[in-house]
Amino acid sequence: VSIDSFDVLVSTHQAYIDAGADVITVNSYASSRLVLDPAGLSSEVRSINMKNIDAARLARERCGDDAVLIAGSISHALSFASEQEKSTATCIEAFDEMVSFFEEGEVDLILLEMMSIPTRMLPLFRSVSSSTLPVWCGLSAQRAAPTALITGYHDETIPLIDNIQDA
């Protein structure tokens, strides 16, 4: 979106601010190298993410409300085209890169979205813990049955609390 429809992205952020949002989220949930490389966009990872940040910053500037915070979004999602799990080292490299974009773009905080897969959560937690930016973490969980343990989305055998305690 940031490449082809930058103005639409800015307008969307502005609409959220006009509606009273205290925090706007950079359109970066699915723009890490883990998602963009398989889509053939490896040479554009930096450009896409910096434009995403610029769109949020421009919207805040146009609205004239410096109290609105900008959250840089990171997920541990892989490309839908990806058929195999990525190595921990590959994940850390991609997550560190996203953190560096957010620091360079001067976002106000990092938002971890839909955390549910322990093998990718831990490397992401490691990457964001090296940043001076505050971190907001959203967990994704489910129950297989009404009386079952709350578990991570992808592994019903591991209680969610165990994932959090490991992190």
Name each region found by the language model.
Residues 1-167:
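Domain-level signal for soluble alpha/beta catalytic cores
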